[in-house]
Amino acid sequence: MVDKYANWVSSGFGKSIAKKLGLPIPVKLKRYSEQKKPLGLEVLFGSFQQGRVAQSVKEILSHLPIVNYITEEGQIYRITEAGKMESKDDQLKFHGLIFDATEVKTLEDLKAVYNFFHPVARRIKSSGRVIILAKDPADCEDAVAAMANRGLVGFIKSLGKEVGQGIAAQIVLVSEGAERNLASTLDFLLSYKSA
């Protein structure tokens, strides 16, 4: 179906009128196409602690057709077959940001989530992806851990509104032992099929 408003706003005349009237100008989303499968998309992965989920996600990402980056102690490294190389490119933009917050147990631990996203939130490409992996609050040991994990839902909603530009922000609740089944979920969420 053709969106007449989007087409009108995309024209020079329509764009100038929309700006003067304060009307929203929709972002043109990238869509999945069998003929144009995206390869080599840059994905940055970080985690609060190196638990089972973080190890599983690193393994999964190494098998996807992406350029894999990790962050450790505030530094970004590119993962290659030879190992990890420090990334010196401050202008590098990412297709996806993935953060493993399944080990978050206290409200103070949520600072690690902020510390991961704050320096790179403006470095997400248009139609990019932001994914937080969190523990299901129902599986948490105590009320504080459940509150902290529930707070991640609010964080991802706020982040999604903040970054805009057609960027999809999602949270995946990971139950105990489900880290082995994350491959298809991450593959789908990182693809343009999930737009």
Residue ranges and their predicted role:
Residues M1-A195:
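Glycine-rich nucleotide cofactor-binding loops and adjacent beta-alpha elements
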